[in-house]
Amino acid sequence: MAEHDYHEDYGLNSFNDSSQEEHQDFLQFRKVFLPCMYLVVFVCGLVGNSLVLVISIFYHKLQSLTDVFLVNLPLADLVFVCTLPFWAYAGIHEWIFGQVMCKTLLGVYTINFYTSMLILTCITVDRFIVVVKATKAYNQQAKRMTWGKVICLLIWVISLLVSLPQIIYGNVFNLDKLICGYHDKEISTVVLATQMTLGFFLPLLAMIVCYSVIIKTLLHAGGFQKHRSLKIIFLVMAVFLLTQTPFNLVKLIRSTHWEYYAMTSFHYTIIVTEAIAYLRACLNPVLYAFVSLKFRKNFWKLVKDIGCLPYLGVSHQWKSSEDNSKTFSASHNVEATSMFQL
């Protein structure tokens, strides 16, 4: 996988504390576990993010800044998960797709990883502005929409620029088998620092600061939506911490304590936490789109239009609930967002 550089694979071949039998057991486990997890994330992420894109583009339309972000986020996650079948095959067998595909997929994988994390950060800041600066946000919706599109464009450009080391130095190497990665230790350090900063610490800091203020604001507000909004905030934070913290902690340990490369148990930890981290691509559609009542209503419209299920008379139910939600939002001069129009 893209996270596995030359040094990691070299470490697998230079263990000291593990027996040959334990090492072979680990290789067999990795050969089965990672491809299976990649395929699960691929299928779930493909379905979930495709649904979000289709509904956002053809049903929901771009009505707010949040909508702009909720088009770019599933797009990034969708392209990200589409690289996983290649890594799954390489995990079972070896890299057979050549050097050009190696560089291309490393670049695509990395660009969309950074884009997804930076957009999550922007969504967090946007929610902060909408709740804490509600009146100002409401009065400047058009300007915020324009800036949102510019910000999304900048995010894609920045993601491309910070992904250049993987694209330039990515190559195919022959260890026990052909692998796609990069073997320069200095490049690995730069890549790790960038991934930790943009892919973990930045969104984590934004969530801690913004959601702390949002929670304080909601606790002093009235309305029937307050408790549900708080639950969603805690759920978003919990999912991010549970899926991203273990793998980033392991990567940090891996970069500072090379002796762990000789421990087979540590490599189990690497691949398990890596698989957990990729679950974000499956969970983002649920956390950032399907929590919206309007989005769920549009989902049922899509289901009706493609004829998969009868509409079952749910239209009136969604309409009634949506009217209540709009009343709540309007009374607070709050722009409709995926978190607060529930």
Swiss-Prot record:
Domain of life of the native organism:
Eukaryota
- Mapped to this chain, the residue ranges on the Extracellular side of the membrane are 1-32, 90-103, 165-187, 260-275
Instruction: Report the GO molecular function annotations.
Output: C-C chemokine binding; C-C chemokine receptor activity; C-X-C chemokine receptor activity; coreceptor activity
Gene Ontology CC terms, in alphabetical order: external side of plasma membrane
Which one Pfam family would you cite for this protein?
7tm_1
Which PROSITE patterns does the protein's record reference?
G_PROTEIN_RECEP_F1_1, G_PROTEIN_RECEP_F1_2
UniProt entry keywords in alphabetical sequence: Cell membrane, Disulfide bond, G-protein coupled receptor, Glycoprotein, Membrane, Receptor, Transducer, Transmembrane, Transmembrane helix
Compartment(s) where it occurs, according to its Swiss-Prot or TrEMBL record: Cell membrane
Any one GO biological process: calcium-mediated signaling
Glycosylated residues (UniProt): N16
What ranges does the Cytoplasmic topological domain annotation cover? Answer: 60-68, 126-143, 216-231, 294-342
Q: Which residues cross the membrane?
A: 33-59, 69-89, 104-125, 144-164, 188-215, 232-259, 276-293
Q: How does it sit in the membrane?
A: Multi-pass membrane protein
Q: Which cysteines are joined by disulfide bonds?
A: C102-C180
Q: Per the similarity annotation, which family is this? A: Belongs to the G-protein coupled receptor 1 family.
Please identify the protein, giving its name as recorded: C-X-C chemokine receptor type 6
Provenance organism: Macaca nemestrina (Pig-tailed macaque)
Q: Which gene encodes it?
A: CXCR6
